[in-house]
Curated annotation (Swiss-Prot):
The active site is at Y23, H100. Substrate binds at N74, H80, D87, I101, S102, R111. It comes from Bacillus cereus (strain G9842). Pfam families: DHquinase_II. The lineage of its organism: Bacteria, Bacillati, Bacillota, Bacilli, Bacillales. GO terms for biological process: amino acid biosynthetic process; aromatic amino acid family biosynthetic process; chorismate biosynthetic process; quinate catabolic process. Signal peptide: none annotated. Pathway: Metabolic intermediate biosynthesis; chorismate biosynthesis; chorismate from D-erythrose 4-phosphate and phosphoenolpyruvate: step 3/7. It is an enzyme of class 4 (lyase). Its EC number is 4.2.1.10. Catalyzes a trans-dehydration via an enolate intermediate. It catalyses: 3-dehydroquinate = 3-dehydroshikimate + H2O. This is 3-dehydroquinate dehydratase. The record marks R18 as: Transition state stabilizer. Keywords: Amino-acid biosynthesis, Aromatic amino acid biosynthesis, Lyase.
Amino acid sequence: MKKLLLVNGPNLNRLGVREVNVYGKGTLATLEADMKQEAETMGVELECFQSNHEGAIIDIIHEAEDIYEGIILNPGAFTHYSYAIRDAIASISIPVIEVHISNIHQRESFRHESVTAAVCAGQIVGFGFYGYKLALFALMEKLRGA
């Protein structure tokens, strides 16, 4: 069975209470449970990780290469300035799909640039929690060689 990793970055543990007008009322626990269920229907095992700390995210990305076949990553605000996370993604051979709940290109100007997207297999933004499922579908296609 394929194993995939879902990584959520800073402040995503506050889903459901933080800026519900932007991120919705769903919680991280709900998102993770829904994603695990969706992955299971595809015959895939999905493990979830969340951290507010850049180093912890870098560590899990490094470790992932030997354990998982791909990563779905929401780097949160690190998207816009973490060259260290960008370098961690670039240093591994498994595909990474970047996902964002909101459309970062329609928000404040400082959110428009993603320093991590260029080293990811793709980026999905603006579809709420459904974007994570789209990322899962895209990652599975990437792993099939599509």
